[in-house]
Amino acid sequence: MAERTLVGLALKVGPLGEHDRLLSLLSDAEGVTRLAVPGARRPKSSLAAAAPLTLLELQVGGRSGLARVRQLRVLHSHAGLGRQLETLSAAQAFCDLCLQIGREDPVEGLLATLQLHLERLDQRSDCLDELLASSVQGAIHLLTLGGYSLPLQSCCLSGAPLEPPIGTWEWRCSLLPMDGFAIDRQPGAAMTLNPSELALLQRLTRADLPRRRDGELMGPRPVWLRLLAVVEIWIRTHLQRGNPALAMLRECVTAKQVSQHGADAANS
């Protein structure tokens, strides 16, 4: 295999034998590539910087089998996301998604989109609701790039436009996991959404989070948890397995919500 230079983000790093590491790298050139990093588990190895959530420039080669990293340079690290379990869970969820959707062939824009959403997680780490919303939106953007977009524009049964009538609170649409969203309550639905929930979900395909005129995030935390559930169901159905990191994020947010309610009750 020819010597080459790769620039990409470390999605996953695990042990390989006694002294080496196995690196899963996302790059524009090759999509997801598995590489051996020789000696990276040794304390003073020059290749020990091959860590998850790190943007790397690698010199790679090898005559046959698993390609090996010859040299390594760290271009940027998202290690700060590990300071909180919530941001770490969201970042891990993004990486796991990229491992699934970028494995076959390179996906144009996937690396840049992943880095953008990792930066947003870091910027919004101080506000739990913003972090949760960014996690839902980031997952939707990555799914769309990978060809697994949520069909949010038309009813999967009738083909009629999905136009949520804001203010008509008895209206519902149903999530049919294999097919998409259908108007009205439908048998076999995994969950139903009201008009404001669907409208909020539809806006997540845009570049920025939905905000009110005063700049505040639209939607309360329980609604964002419901939209997270939509994403979890879609991933589990169409990628053949769930995303444990998203489940961990849900647990973290729910636990903080319960803790906050307890504190509010004690102070009242």
From Swiss-Prot:
What this chain does, per the entry, is described as: Involved in DNA repair and RecF pathway recombination.
Lineage: superkingdom: Bacteria
Which positions, given as ranges, span the membrane? none
Give the family, as the similarity comment puts it: Belongs to the RecO family.
**Cellular component, GO annotation:** bacterial nucleoid
Q: Name one GO biological process term.
A: DNA recombination
Keywords for the protein's UniProt record, in alphabetical order: DNA damage, DNA recombination, DNA repair
Q: Which InterPro entries match?
A: ARFGAP/RecO, DNA_rep/recomb_RecO_N, NA-bd_OB-fold, RecO
- Please tell me whether the keyword DNA damage is annotated for this protein: yes
The name this protein carries in UniProt is DNA repair protein RecO
Task: Give the species this sequence originates from.
Answer: Parasynechococcus marenigrum (strain WH8102)
